[in-house]
Swiss-Prot record:
Function: The glycine cleavage system catalyzes the degradation of glycine. The H protein shuttles the methylamine group of glycine from the P protein to the T protein.
UniProt record similarity statement: Belongs to the GcvH family.
Organism: Methylobacillus flagellatus (strain ATCC 51484 / DSM 6875 / VKM B-1610 / KT)
Cofactor note: Binds 1 lipoyl cofactor covalently.
Name of protein: Glycine cleavage system H protein
Length: 123
């Protein structure tokens, strides 16, 4: 299983990383996309949406099931990856490049997992 060292993770199987503009990108992990199977639809939170850490903020649907996206941190959504509206399967092909939304954290990020901690969580 692919768990890049340069990312941070949530127990709800999201990865996050800062971008060059000081915002953070969020997407689902390789483990999550593997469990979901072939992804057919992504409902990202709209720009301007207020995020509350751990609360549902979007949805990923596959041919097998659907799964809520849970906000990784408190903050405000700044953009969504519009390409995923047309080609949601990009998440299956490249889960760590296919970010779902970007956001501006309300405060310094805390409570995120390192790659080693996420790997341990998965067992």
């Amino acid at each position: 299983m692919n768990i890049p060292e340069n990312l941070q993770y949530t127990a709800e199987h999201l990865w996050v990383r800062p971008d060059e503009n000081g915002h953070w990108l969020a997407g689902i992990t390789d483990h999550a996309q593997d469990l979901l199977g072939d992804i057919v639809y992504v409902e990202a939170p709209k720009p301007g949406t207020r995020l509350s850490a751990g609360q549902p903020c979007g949805l990923v649907e596959s041919v097998k099931t659907g799964s809520d996206l849970h906000a990784p941190l408190d903050g405000t959504v700044t953009a969504i990856n519009e390409a995923l509206q047309i080609t949601p399967e990009e998440i299956n092909d490249r889960p760590y490049d296919a970010w779902i939304f970007s956001f501006e954290p309300e405060h310094a990020p805390t409570g995120l997992l390192s790659a080693a901690e996420y790997r341990a969580l998965l067992g």
